[in-house]
A protein has these predicted regions:
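A SIS-like phosphosugar-recognition module
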Residues: 1-36, 42-207
Length: 207
């Protein structure tokens, strides 16, 4: 069990605990400062997001989340949280693939779409150029970190948790304790272990 207590529906405590445990193990193995954890992260490293800045973004049906490098894992976590609690539709795309075709979505659906850029140090340049091109065409906001290490990663996760909380308030949903339908509870308790499924390669079945 994690010392921070029981998880809510979105398993925020477990997410942070897993990152911390993995970083601690990798630091002990490699002695690489990239994985070094601070002793007082919650006290000194959390900066509240400006809700007003994100209000218009949260009103849109679809949010395209641009990511790259260290922010990729955070992007996937954000998508899972929005989907699991029905906060909105999220499209995940890295900056390169957005530039190479995925931008067409906003050519026809700009009124119902916003863009959120998750920006690490390596993405600063491309994020600024992308933002300049899109200015005035679509709502475009960003969450940024300065550190290319596990501390920066944790900061970005905390920003995303705040964003999910804002989205919940916008849609009158408690992301940590949504009203789950009875069929959802039955699905959750279905027994299925892929490790015990037949190995069709061993059964020599042709495709």
């Amino acid at each position: 069990s994690v010392p921070c207590g029981r998880d809510g529906f979105l398993a925020v405590n477990s997410t942070i605990a897993s990152i911390a445990l993995l970083a601690k193990a990798l630091f002990e193995m490699t002695n690489d400062d990239f994985y070094s954890l601070p002793n007082d992260f919650l006290r000194n490293n959390i900066t509240p997001l400006e809700r007003g800045k994100l209000q218009n973004l949260l009103k849109k049906d679809t949010v395209i989340v641009l990511h790259g490098g260290i922010t990729t894992s955070v992007a996937y976590d954000l998508e899972s949280k929005f989907s699991e609690v029905a906060l909105g539709n999220i499209q995940l795309v890295d900056f390169r693939n957005f530039a190479h075709g995925r931008h067409y979505w906003i050519s026809t659906r700009a009124d119902e779409t916003a863009i959120l850029m998750l920006v690490g140090p390596d993405e600063n340049s491309i994020a600024k150029k992308t933002s300049c091109i899109l200015e005035g065409k679509i709502i475009c906001e960003s969450l940024s970190i300065c550190e290319e290490n596990v501390i920066g990663l944790l900061k970005m996760f905390v920003d995303v948790f705040q964003l999910v909380s804002f989205a919940g308030e916008e849609h009158n949903i408690d992301p940590g304790c949504p009203k789950v339908a009875e069929f959802g509870r039955k699905l959750y308790h279905l027994s299925y272990n892929p490790c015990t499924a037949p190995d069709h390669r061993k059964l020599k079945k042709s495709i």
